[in-house]
Amino acid sequence: MNWQPLTIALVPTAIAWSITVWQVRTQRVRQIEDVYVARYWSLLDKFSAATLRGLDGHMLEPQEELAIRLYFRLSEDEADLRSQGWVSDDTWRDWSGAISSQMHRQPFARLWVQTLEDAEDGRDYEFKHLRRLLHDRAYDPPPSGILRGWLRRAPWRRSTGS
């Protein structure tokens, strides 16, 4: 039996299939990132000008305090998605820097201390990723599986950012 015609047909098919899977996955990652960006902006809309400027000492409205606490959860979710491979390298670089900066600004920093106390008492999330990110701006959540870890370190995944 001559395998050449079959090989000629299967190799391009396998390559085309691989490219299609990669493109679909990349599109799905972008869709997930877009959803989280929209959630971020909807929370930002609930902040007063004083909060956006990082001023402390003003009385937070209940809606504003809730939005800040939801921001913490959103940020933890983003880090979780990163560990599952659903956030790209470039996007995580942007998000992690912004999250770290925001967590050090008032009134976020003050509410973060309260949130940690609640977490220690079992009344809130554990926030394992945010705790690390707060102290290490370059923190990148470890991949949740062996294959994801290998893929994240793969040589063809070159950074397009700085």
Stretches with model-predicted labels:
Residues 63-68, 72-162:
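An amphipathic alpha-helical interaction surface
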Residues 1-65:
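Membrane-proximal alpha-helical anchors
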